[in-house]
Amino acid sequence: MMVSNVKVYDLEESIIASGYPMRTTAEMRPVDEKDIKRCINLSNACNTGNGAHGQYLTGIRVAFDLTCSNKMWVEAERYRFLEFVSSQSTMHRITKFDLSNQYNEYVDPRVIEIMKEKVDAYNNFCNDIDFGLIPQDVGLQLELQEEKKKRYLEILYTNPAGFELTARLTTNYRCLKNIYIQRKDHRLPEWRKFCAWIETLPMFKELCLSGDDNG
């Protein structure tokens, strides 16, 4: 699991905006200690059951690239506000990846060898068709295309859960707080590592974990 190309937006602006409900003016200014104290109090209120006080956290936006296994991706997709910008695709490119470097350490090497064999056989089969090494009358062309589809599907469905892909994601501190609380002690080491990264985000601990045992 790896996180890279991280951008955090509207941190100070959202901290200031957290005070809007109790103000009669709404100008932007530098963040001061009073603002931080207010946000910590809001965090404490959230962590004791009043989640509405954490609304301002939705304004602190985070964009990043995440590289992780298919297994983690399936679980990540349940978070509505963890949005995909774009991602690598096994559906389009499974036969083009360097499989020697695409799996995490928990994938059985025998499975990787099976995948390599299937991909090599598929690519050789396609090359033979493209270069006319297989005689092609009209009837045979249909059979070859069906065989090609079948072999590709075998590769897709044989590919193990430890295959790693990269996606660009966008989310906010409120969503990341939920992920952190739910996943910090998860069985998958990828989730624990991801939660450790969340802790490094600017002021995340102060704004999201103050007064909470999860910190």
Language-model segment annotations:
Residues 1-215:
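Family-specific signature for flavin-dependent thymidylate synthase
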